[in-house]
């Protein structure tokens, strides 16, 4: 059996970058393996035989999975196989989906499934951007109609220099980290974060990445020349064109009037009524009603776009750069550690902050870092009632995970380090109303709630979503877009940051690419809008509260010798469990000797400190201790004073009487009050029972309260 291996190769960041095909997954419409270093990602693209009926969207599904075998591990836990997708896998799948989705032809409704597996992972190169290149390459060499290719790269800036597809080590040192995807002529997707970097630097990073993207596109073109299949043609529906002309003639002006209604619900109700009227007047057959509704949606979109492009009038009457009215309230409920309501027009986020011990952080496992503890978390929830829909709540969606990650990345650079603020921090954003920009409302509400919680952030962070309406060479950038402007427009460009620079950025488009001019204007307009919002946020709460909530745990820090940590824990955790049960505190122990006590009251913290200090006591000559007898011989008994610290009670030191054997008076398990009489050069302890003074409290009495 002969199998042809087809390979093309270039170099990225000093490492070979290879795309290969021909010897695997041959029943898929297209399949490739993309390699950089020892990291390899398989991507397969499959198309259904027939299109779906009665839909007006592209049924594209992207799945990305990081196989444990790729980095030489067996899954932990009882079930030894990969489970549901992790948050990271979902986020990478979204990054693969977003740049390819705009590049399928209009009217193409066949199911497309893109599956990406990380087959091998080294300790240098992140496989996520290889998945973007692989998805494009698999589609490009297949017979699936795809108006690509595109490519994706990660751009980082380390010590002032831009690097494409950096190693993990380089990425950790970067002040800019973005994933950029683009075609030969323009950028189609951006996702990433920065440490308060000026917009000009972000744009420079995008353009730098685009130069490398062109090289990877040439590589895909070379691969297609070697093995590309003939593309299927998408049929033009002549009947649809006729129906569109009729609907447009009947409804265009009426829809234009409806767009003068600024209330979203009333406007949509009127637009729906116009369609019902058109359906009856034009006598559209029942079997074509679904198709007619999709065509009508396009006409509605065109009316909105024409109003903005030609008259500068938006759906709610605002100018292109105008931001909706903002209302802010902080400290909403007393029992939340921090809370805020951020309302912008018909978009509202209720955001809370909860502080906890460091051990309450999220444990995550990834190819990059293995198992790590994440102390700052942001969770975004989008209930159906926020849009007035009568639907039951569902499991967390990919969209919710993506929006939460975007907002988390925006706030994280301003979160103080663990040494300064030793708490795990959980931010939760519940969207109460939605009409566009809910993730950016989450950023603003999150910053306000963190200030309210007393988290010592140096600055507020705000976010704004920008839109675009583009027709040929004419375009208008929209600030603070509505939901309809997002759905019917050409771009959703979210930018978050402080007054000093950008911390998070995300761009999705529905056209085939954006020029540098459009990106530059969008970033500038976003900065102006962000600064306006920040002014209002500083008016609401100008600085973080001086103290955390009385209902939040206080942190008391102790420094002990590292060899005392096992003593604090005790056998099978006995000692630390006892402290926690009696004081209701939480305790984090560091192997280096740092002890953090999280308590909800000053008294509980003081009691826990006292109990720990008693535990780590050093045995001193002349002091009185309690001890448990662990062994008895004729010549004496062995008494444990502290965990692991045995002493000898000689038979002559038990009573004033002469005893033949210690067993006459003492048995294993007895708890005795003894006085330390001697500690020799080797640390061996001798104690006396007969010389114990009356009315003296043992220094380690705490250990024996239950005895």
From Swiss-Prot:
GO terms for molecular function: 3'-5'-RNA exonuclease activity; magnesium ion binding; polyribonucleotide nucleotidyltransferase activity; RNA binding. Its cofactor is Mg(2+). InterPro entries: ExoRNase_PH_dom1, ExoRNase_PH_dom2, ExoRNase_PH_dom2_sf, KH_dom, KH_dom_type_1, KH_dom_type_1_sf, NA-bd_OB-fold, PNPase. Gene3D superfamilies: GHMP Kinase, N-terminal domain, K Homology domain, type 1, Nucleic acid-binding proteins. Mg(2+) binds at residues 486, 492. One of its GO terms (cellular component) is cytosol. This is Polyribonucleotide nucleotidyltransferase. It comes from Sulfurihydrogenibium azorense (strain DSM 15241 / OCM 825 / Az-Fu1). The lineage of its organism: Bacteria, Pseudomonadati, Aquificota, Aquificia, Aquificales. The gene is pnp.
């Amino acid at each position: 059996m002969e199998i042809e291996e087809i390979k093309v190769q270039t170099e990225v960041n000093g490492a070979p970058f290879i795309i290969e095909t021909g010897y695997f997954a041959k029943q898929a419409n297209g399949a490739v393996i993309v390699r950089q270093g020892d990291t390899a990602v398989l991507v397969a693209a499959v198309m259904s035989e027939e299109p779906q009926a009665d839909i007006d969207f592209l049924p594209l599904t992207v799945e990305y999975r990081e196989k444990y075998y790729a980095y030489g591990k067996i899954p932990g836990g009882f079930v030894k196989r990969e489970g549901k997708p992790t948050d990271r896998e979902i986020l990478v799948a979204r990054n693969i989906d977003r740049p390819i989705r705009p590049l399928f032809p209009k009217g193409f409704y066949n199911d497309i499934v893109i599956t990406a597996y990380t087959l091998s992972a080294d300790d240098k190169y992140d496989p996520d951007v290889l998945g973007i290149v692989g998805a494009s390459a698999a589609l490009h060499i297949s017979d699936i109609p795809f108006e690509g290719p595109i490519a994706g790269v990660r751009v980082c800036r380390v010590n002032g220099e831009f690097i494409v597809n950096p190693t993990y080590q380089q990425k950790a040192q970067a002040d800019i980290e973005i994933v950029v995807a683009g075609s030969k002529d323009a950028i189609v997707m951006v996702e990433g974060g920065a440490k308060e970097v000026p917009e000009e630097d972000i744009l420079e990073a995008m353009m730098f990445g685009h130069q490398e993207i062109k090289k990877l596109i040439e590589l895909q073109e070379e691969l297609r020349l070697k093995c590309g299949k003939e593309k299927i043609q998408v049929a033009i529906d002549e009947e649809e064109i006729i129906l569109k002309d009729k609907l447009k003639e009947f409804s265009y002006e009426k829809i234009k009037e409806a767009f003068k209604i600024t209330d979203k619900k009333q406007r949509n109700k009127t637009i729906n009524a116009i369609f019902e009227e058109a359906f009856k007047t034009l006598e559209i057959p029942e079997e074509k009603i679904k198709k007619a509704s999709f065509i009508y949606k396009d006409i509605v979109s065109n009316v909105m776009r024409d109003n903005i492009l030609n008259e500068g009038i938006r759906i709610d009457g605002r100018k292109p750069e105008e931001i909706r009215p903002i209302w802010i309230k902080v400290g909403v409920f007393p029992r939340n550690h921090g809370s805020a309501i951020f309302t912008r027009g018909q978009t509202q986020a209720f955001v809370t902050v909860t502080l906890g011990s460091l051990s309450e952080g999220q444990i995550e496992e990834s190819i990059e870092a293995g198992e790590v503890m994440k102390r700052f978390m942001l969770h975004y929830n989008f209930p159906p009632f926020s849009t007035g829909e009568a639907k039951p709540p569902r499991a967390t969606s990919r969209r919710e995970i993506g929006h939460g990650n975007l907002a988390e990345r925006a706030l994280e650079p301003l979160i103080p380090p663990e040494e300064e603020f030793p708490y795990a921090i959980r931010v939760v954003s519940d969207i109460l109303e939605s009409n566009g920009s809910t993730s950016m409302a989450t950023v603003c509400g999150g910053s306000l709630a963190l200030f309210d919680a007393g988290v010592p952030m140096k600055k507020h962070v705000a976010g704004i979503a920008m839109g675009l309406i583009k027709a040929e060479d004419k375009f208008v950038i929209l600030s603070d877009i509505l939901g309809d402007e997002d759905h019917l427009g050409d771009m959703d460009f979210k930018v978050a940051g402080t007054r000093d620079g950008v911390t998070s950025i995300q761009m999705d488009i529905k056209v085939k690419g954006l020029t540098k001019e459009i990106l530059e204007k969008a970033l500038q307009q976003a900065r102006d809008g962000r600064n306006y919002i920040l002014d209002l946020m500083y008016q609401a709460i100008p600085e973080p509260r001086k103290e955390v909530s009385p209902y939040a745990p206080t942190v008391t820090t102790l420094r002990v010798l590292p060899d005392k940590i096992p003593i604090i824990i005790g056998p099978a955790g006995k000692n630390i469990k006892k402290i926690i049960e009696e004081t209701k505190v939480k305790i984090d122990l560091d192997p280096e000797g740092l002890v953090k006590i999280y308590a909800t009251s000053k008294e509980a913290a003081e009691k826990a400190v006292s109990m720990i200090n008693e535990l780590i006591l050093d045995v001193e000559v002349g002091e009185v201790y309690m001890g448990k007898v662990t062994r008895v011989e004729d010549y004496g008994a062995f008494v444990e004073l502290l965990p692991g610290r045995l002493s000898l009670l000689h038979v002559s030191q038990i009573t004033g009487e002469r005893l033949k054997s210690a067993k006459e008076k003492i048995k294993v398990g007895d708890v005795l009050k003894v006085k330390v009489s001697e500690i020799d050069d080797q640390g061996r302890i001798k104690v006396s029972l007969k010389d114990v003074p009356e009315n003296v409290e043992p220094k380690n009495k705490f250990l024996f309260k239950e005895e």
